[in-house]
């Protein structure tokens, strides 16, 4: 699976490549800017989702619309907003959100449920506003008052999966306890699904990779290693990798990648959880935990700044 020579893109830069990326072939796609660049193509996202959803033949996604950093806001009764990394809809009326999560925090599971609730409401709202739904007879619309569209949340995690340690793939759905006791582990509804993928726990070699989902997991895990990745014979994957090649990245992408770690909210949740745990063990604060874990000086400095901030206005 040797990499074939590909035509080099012409990139005009006004600044030198940052030191952090010198000697590396790709940008790390577990960080937000490179993650967006990797999937900034309908065919790439369809290939990934078809693999993750295990769709084949006529079931494969044929039409896909998507948007990065989609804000979803409702009043319940106070205003509440979440921002999806990727919000996507298929031609068949399926609604999806795809999240890249680098850090685990104490309320991660709660967060996945909250995001799913917003996705369900957003999907229902768009479904009832569609031309197809409005064209239905009044009685049919009334019958479907509580009908929900299929919604799928995909969480790509750079850590162990909740309730599935050491595994790289897990799925959640709504089950009947009675049915499970009787050996029938079938979801009550196929419309409500969570898929969790652990990037570091995907340890298959390039030769062991099978199917598009595993190809994407392999590159998500190994693009950050620094070297050239093998050619899997998938042109869509190769084009996606070209978008995160250091030599192809413009100043804007390189600058964003250099400064991006995770969202402010992730750091606040994670740092607060670590600090509380540290205090319970008699540690001075979360900084000592960072240092013992071997965190980089940059991460320690950023954590110190965040913990020292008196209010959210400190973060710009």
Regions found by a protein language model. Name each.
Residues 1-193, 205, 277, 281, ...:
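Accessory alpha/beta interaction modules
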Residues 2-25, 29, 51-52, 87, ...:
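Short, charged alpha-helical interaction segments and adjacent helix-coil junctions
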């Amino acid at each position: 699976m040797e990499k074939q020579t590909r035509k080099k893109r012409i990139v005009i830069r006004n600044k030198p490549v940052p030191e952090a990326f010198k000697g590396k072939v790709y940008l790390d796609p577990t960080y937000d800017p490179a993650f967006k660049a990797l999937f900034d193509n309908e065919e790439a996202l369809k290939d990934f989702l078809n693999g993750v959803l295990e769709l084949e033949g006529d079931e494969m996604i044929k039409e896909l619309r998507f948007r990065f950093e989609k804000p979803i806001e409702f009043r319940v009764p106070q205003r509440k907003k979440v921002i999806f990394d990727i919000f996507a809809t298929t031609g068949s009326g399926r609604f999806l959100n795809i999240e890249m999560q680098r850090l685990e925090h104490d309320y991660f599971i709660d967060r996945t449920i909250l995001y799913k609730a917003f996705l369900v409401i957003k999907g229902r709202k768009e479904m009832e506003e569609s031309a197809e739904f409005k064209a239905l007879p009044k009685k049919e619309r009334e019958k479907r008052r509580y009908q929900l569209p299929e919604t799928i949340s995909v969480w790509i995690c750079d850590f162990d999966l909740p309730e599935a340690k050491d595994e790289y793939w897990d799925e959640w759905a709504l089950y009947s306890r009675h049915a499970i006791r009787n050996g029938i582990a079938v979801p009550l509804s196929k419309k409500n699904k969570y898929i969790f993928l652990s990037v570091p726990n995907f340890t298959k070699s390039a030769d062991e990779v099978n199917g598009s989902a595993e190809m994407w997991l392999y590159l998500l895990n190994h693009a950050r290693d620094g070297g050239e990745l093998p050619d899997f014979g998938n042109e869509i994957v190769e084009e996606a990798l070209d978008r995160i090649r250091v030599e192809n990245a413009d100043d804007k992408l390189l600058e964003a990648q250099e400064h991006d770690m995770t969202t402010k909210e992730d750091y606040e949740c994670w740092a607060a959880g670590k600090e509380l745990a540290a205090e319970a063990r008699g540690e001075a604060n979360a900084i000592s935990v960072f240092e013992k874990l071997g965190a980089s000086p940059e991460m320690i400095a950023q954590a110190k700044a965040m913990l020292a901030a008196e209010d959210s206005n400190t973060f710009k």
